[in-house]
Amino acid sequence: MNEKEIKRLTSLHIKKYRDEHKQFLIEGKRIIAEALESGADIVKLYSASELEESIITAANDHKIPIENVDERLAQKISSTVSPSGVLALCSIPKKD
């Protein structure tokens, strides 16, 4: 992952940039599993920890790339105090 991508991901903590890029981050295994089940538009998964087999299978079924990142980088991208090490980049759905 290059520095430009890291900056873009960390910028998504601010609403202005979420609106500009039309993307947002979700964090945690459970919420990512729920997003996959509901058909959310997940662009990419980032993992610094072991993913559950069900998440890997669902990501592969939806052709979602999974990028392994080190824990330090996951903490930098995360907006939580104690990050789970699993993040997903999602597209904001278009309003009808």
Annotate each language-model stretch with its function:
Residues K29, K94-D96:
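A short, well-structured juxtamembrane/interface segment
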Residues M1-I55:
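Boundary-proximal intrinsically disordered activation/regulatory segments immediately upstream
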Residues N2-E3, A48, D70-L73, D96:
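General structural signal for secondary-structure boundaries
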Residues A59-K94:
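Glycine/small-residue-rich loop that forms an oxyanion/phosphate-binding "nest" at active or ligand-binding sites
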